[in-house]
Amino acid sequence: MNPTPPVIALVVAMAENRAIGLGGNLPWHLSSDMRYFRKITMGKPIVMGRLTFKSLGRALPGRVNIVLTRDRDFVAPGAIMAHSLAEGLAQARRAAEEAGVDEIMIIGGEDVFREVLPEARRIYLTEVHAAPEADTWFHQLDGREWREVFREDHAPGPKDDHPFSFVVLERT
């Protein structure tokens, strides 16, 4: 058993206007971000809301998928269902302990991010340097509560619509 409980980490791609979604999808295309997401979440439990699961279309391989929903009839093939954040995090902690990993990855959506933010210790943030139309937004962070510990800037490319930065924030 790992004596240190796993860190709760948010994984979010956010535009300059705090946009994170449009019509259940990302409002941009960044292949590099998809590869980064896969790299940082692989082997770790991922927790998401029902709408995020539906937008993915399937459970993501190589990770324990936990879906939060109040709809007790909803079925997410290949995922563990949880009907509260507390239940979902308890399942994620067990999965992290069994896998020997030190992070629980929260991957969305808007309501899940907002609810879990007070418990989060780390944020893997992809800053998308654009301001697209959106209908889903990320919570405004209090800059006094977070410090940047990593930044890697990228120019747009053939499979990346916009310039972007990979940023890691740690709670102060």
Label for each model-derived stretch:
Residues 3-7, 11-172:
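Flexible, gly/pro- and Lys/Arg-enriched active-site loops
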